[in-house]
């Protein structure tokens, strides 16, 4: 069979409400409206007998040891659940920053599962595919079919596709990797403790851009404040985006350090990206659309 290819887009938390810390397992219970960007890693699979991975691209260096890569971890989980699973050699081209709050590794893992599902004629809702996604990481299930939807719990509750209008946006990462654990530690919730705050607004399917902004503007990312104590440069990135013409909303994604801003139109987003690149030439800056 010939080479298979798919994209692994950045996952953006348009909202991220932390409801509390669950008494049973200690995980943080979340509600998040998730969208996906046009900017992405690329994953290829050359079918063959042995499982292998090669990583290249501008952010390949920080991606860590190959044996621990989520692409291989996801493939191994699926192979454990499907007898005789056909495998092969993966080639991952890394464009997305690592430890950045945009689910790059999770999206890569989900891309691997999509390619293996295609190779083995498995549906994405096949129990073994879902189980492999959950076993690989909390954000992997929502990345299997990368379209806007609600995510709840510790990532295991995935809502239906919302078919939201594309949002012109700019993604900015100030080049500081941020691990999730220190951010949740800074949030400081004890097991069983709930976090005060307004409930997440309801999100209807098929909203246009103005309606999406109307939903997410009064919402929040509850990890933004603790992340600022871990990496204060996040605040600089947010301020720089908010100063750009046409910026309608700027917020951190995930546990950081990537931030995003939604703009009035594509031209404004392109202009803002150019201005941020001039102001901070060492930062990762990408104009894109979120949907």
From Swiss-Prot:
Lineage, broadest ranks: Bacteria, Pseudomonadati, Pseudomonadota, Alphaproteobacteria, Hyphomicrobiales
This protein's name: 4-diphosphocytidyl-2-C-methyl-D-erythritol kinase
Metabolic or biological pathway, per its Swiss-Prot or TrEMBL entry: Isoprenoid biosynthesis; isopentenyl diphosphate biosynthesis via DXP pathway; isopentenyl diphosphate from 1-deoxy-D-xylulose 5-phosphate: step 3/6
Keyword Nucleotide-binding tagged: yes
A single MF term (Gene Ontology): 4-(cytidine 5'-diphospho)-2-C-methyl-D-erythritol kinase activity
Catalytic reactions on record: 4-CDP-2-C-methyl-D-erythritol + ATP = 4-CDP-2-C-methyl-D-erythritol 2-phosphate + ADP + H(+)
Its EC number(s): 2.7.1.148
Protein role: Catalyzes the phosphorylation of the position 2 hydroxy group of 4-diphosphocytidyl-2C-methyl-D-erythritol.
GO biological process, one term: isopentenyl diphosphate biosynthetic process, methylerythritol 4-phosphate pathway
Pfam families given in the database record: GHMP_kinases_C, GHMP_kinases_N
Residues that bind ATP: 97-107
Matches recorded under PANTHER family: 4-DIPHOSPHOCYTIDYL-2-C-METHYL-D-ERYTHRITOL KINASE, CHLOROPLASTIC (PTHR43527:SF2)
Record key words, sorted: ATP-binding, Isoprene biosynthesis, Kinase, Nucleotide-binding, Transferase
Family: Belongs to the GHMP kinase family. IspE subfamily.
Active site: 11, 139
Electron transport in keyword set: no
InterPro entries listed in its UniProt record: GHMP_kinase_C_dom, GHMP_kinase_C_sf, GHMP_kinase_N_dom, IspE, Ribosomal_Su5_D2-typ_SF, Ribsml_uS5_D2-typ_fold_subgr
Principal EC category: transferase
